[in-house]
C-alpha cells in the first residue's frame, strides 16, 4: 500500500490560512487607514532606486508597495480597480474589505460555515445598494453647478490642494464641462483624459491656471517659423522627417563617382517628396513624434507652415481625437505608393506658441471634432506638483461621475451610518443563519465614520454613537427623516447636516466601493487551502558544467 500523496511545497489549510489572510488584509488596511478623510495624513514612499513619492491617494500607496502575500495582493488590486472604474474612494474600499474579513473570521471561529457568511454578505450588499438608491440619493438637477463644486471640494478635502478648495473646484468643473461631447446615442460624455495636465514647479498653488485649448509642452522646430497660424490644418505623424538613409547591410556597387552624388541626391529627394505631399493637401501645422532635420525644416519655413517635433505619442493621440485628424505611422498605402490625403488632416481655429508661466507652450485652440482644456499646475517642488496632479485626477473623475449619474449622496460617514442602522434592523427580520452575517456587515460599515473620527483626533466612540442615534431616529420616526443627511463635521468634532454643508460624493463611488469590497472579502473568505510550491533550484543536479566535469558526470 502506497503512502499519502506528497505535495512539493508548503500547505496550510483551514483556520490557519483564513487567519493568515485576514491578518494580511488588516495590515494592508492599516497602512492606508490614517490617510482617510479631510484630516488624513500623507505617506512618503521610497522605491528601490531612491525615487520619493509623497501621497495621500490610497491607490498610489498600494501600487507602490511590493506586496508578496496573495491575499494582500487582492486588496491592492481592489484599490487599483476602484481607481480605474470610479477614480475616488480607493482608501475606503480597502478599509471596508479588511473590516468585513475581520468580522467574518470571528463568525467562522464561532463555527458558522463560511458559505453562510458569504450568502449573508451578498444579501446585505444587495440590500445596502437598494437602500442607497431608494432613500439616500440627492438629485443633482435641483442643486446645479454648486453640487459639482461641492463634490469636487469633498474629493479634494483630504488632499494637498484642499486649502485652496474653492479655486481648484471651480477649475475642475470648468475643465470637465469644457471637454463635454455627445456620443452616438445622444448621451453626454466627459472624457477626463482629454484634460491635459502640465506641471511647472515654481510660484504658488493658487497661480495654477486653466487654458481653453490643448497645451503642448513643445516649441516650434525652427526660429524662422510662424508662431501663430489661424485656420490650422493639422497633420499628425508618428514617424521622423529626416534625410532617408539606406538600411544597414545594403550594398551599392557603382562604377562612376558621379553616381554617388545621384544616390545622395535621391536620399534627400525622397524626404522632400514626402514633405511636398503633406504640404500639397493644405497642411500648415505638422506634429510628429520623431525628429525633423534642418533640411526638412527649411521646406516648412519656406511654405509658411509650423512644424513641431518630439511630440509625446499620448499628446498626439489626444490632439488627433480632438481635431479629427488621423495618426499616420507611414505614408505608404496598400499598393506600396506613398500618399497623403486632405481627409487625414485635423482642423483647429488657431495654433499659437505662447509664453505661459516660465515656459514656451504651443496652444491648439477651438479644435473641430471636440473641445479640449488644459490645466497648468504650479507648486513649490516636483513632489508637490505630482501629488497635485493625482488629487486633480480624483476630482475630475468625481465631477465626471456626478454629471453622468446625476445623483450624489451625503459624505462624512452619513451613508455608512444609515446603512449600518438599516441593516441591523433588517438582520433581525431574517430567520436564517444569514442574520449573523448581515449584522456583522452592518457593524463593519461603521469602520468608516470611526476611522474618520480617529484621524481627526476626536473621540470616535462618542461621535459614532451620536451619529447612530440620529440615523436611528431618522429611520424610526418618519417626521424626522431629514436627520438621514447627518454626517460628521471633523473640524469641529460634532455631527452636522452634510446636505446643507455641501459634503457630497457621487452615488456610484459609494455603490461601487460597497460592491467591490464585498466581492473582494468573499473572494478571500472562500479560500481554505494554500499550497505554495518550492521554487525550483537554478542549478542542475551537478551544480553546473564545472562541477559536472570534476565529479566525472560527463565521462562515458
Swiss-Prot record:
Q: Which UniProt keywords apply?
A: Acetylation, ATP-binding, Chaperone, Cytoplasm, Cytoskeleton, Hydrolase, Magnesium, Metal-binding, Nucleotide-binding, Phosphoprotein
Respond yes or no to whether keyword Magnesium is given for this record.
Answer: yes
- Show the InterPro entries listed in the entry: Chap_CCT_alpha (IPR012715), Chaperone_TCP-1 (IPR017998), Chaperonin_TCP-1_CS (IPR002194), Cpn60/GroEL/TCP-1 (IPR002423), GroEL-like_apical_dom_sf (IPR027409), GROEL-like_equatorial_sf (IPR027413), TCP-1-like_intermed_sf (IPR027410), TCP-1_chaperonin (IPR053374)
The UniProt entry, under Pfam families, shows: Cpn60_TCP1 (PF00118)
Compartments, as annotated in UniProt: Cytoplasm, Cytosol; Cytoplasm, Cytoskeleton, Microtubule organizing center, Centrosome
Record keywords: Secreted included?
A: no
Instruction: Give an example GO molecular function.
Output: protein folding chaperone
Identify the GO cellular component terms for this protein: acrosomal vesicle; cell body; centrosome; chaperonin-containing T-complex; Golgi apparatus; heterochromatin; microtubule; microtubule organizing center
Q: What is its main location?
A: cytoplasm
Q: Which Gene3D superfamilies match?
A: GroEL, GroEL-like equatorial domain, TCP-1-like chaperonin intermediate domain
Q: Binding positions for ADP?
A: 37, 89-92, 158-159, 412, 505
Q: Which residues bind Mg(2+)?
A: 88
Record-listed Phosphotyrosine modification sites = 181
Read off the SUPFAM superfamilies from this record. GroEL apical domain-like, GroEL equatorial domain-like, GroEL-intermediate domain like
Recorded catalytic reaction(s): these are: ATP + H2O = ADP + phosphate + H(+)
Phosphoserine is found on: 6, 551
Q: PANTHER family under this entry?
A: CHAPERONIN
- What assembly does the database describe for this protein? Component of the chaperonin-containing T-complex (TRiC), a hexadecamer composed of two identical back-to-back stacked rings enclosing a protein folding chamber. Each ring is made up of eight different subunits: TCP1/CCT1, CCT2, CCT3, CCT4, CCT5, CCT6A/CCT6, CCT7, CCT8. Interacts with PACRG. Interacts with GBA1. Interacts with DLEC1.
Family in the record: Belongs to the TCP-1 chaperonin family.
The protein in question is named: T-complex protein 1 subunit alpha
Encoding gene, per UniProt annotation: Tcp1
